[in-house]
Amino acid sequence: HAQGGLPIPDITHIVQHYWYQVGGADSPERPGIKMAQALEQKINELGEHRVAAYIAEPIQGAGGVVIPPDTYWPEISDICRRYQILLVADEVICGFGRTGKWFGSDYYNIQPDLMPIAKGLSSGYLPIAAVMVADHVSQVLIEEGGEFFHGMTYSGHPAACAVACANVRILRDEKIIDRVDTVT
């Protein structure tokens, strides 16, 4: 964010999972855990009552396709569960088979609380986006939030939704994601 700053108050960052920069001759497992533990250090620094969520891409696309060590995401997930912090896996880039699994989260065997999805939902044929919400989060919205206003003028366009449904059906029925997993 050095180029433009981040104008939203109360958003903070932790170190990125560039294990190849900090690991040296070490295996990626130890740096993966160490970098994930930066989240716990930040939680303790800020106070756990001030941290609502951890948001990240399973594989960081914006940073140049940065693949984390296998130990990184399970440790992040454990920390989020321990402190009751929402885990948000941004699946806009990793979703819908790009890792050989339906989602990058599946690749790392983690269960996010929220998953923003977009491009892969329609394979880019029409613009569409959504947020997948875990049952325990949606239940809070239902019980505590009353009405959840989320429909805007151009949201839920029938053509984009039809393309998304057809695309997901094709990915599933033609086992395209399975082929990505075995061929690449």
Predicted regions and their residues:
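Conserved N-terminal phosphate-binding loop of PLP-dependent enzymes in the Aspartate aminotransferase
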Residues: 1-184
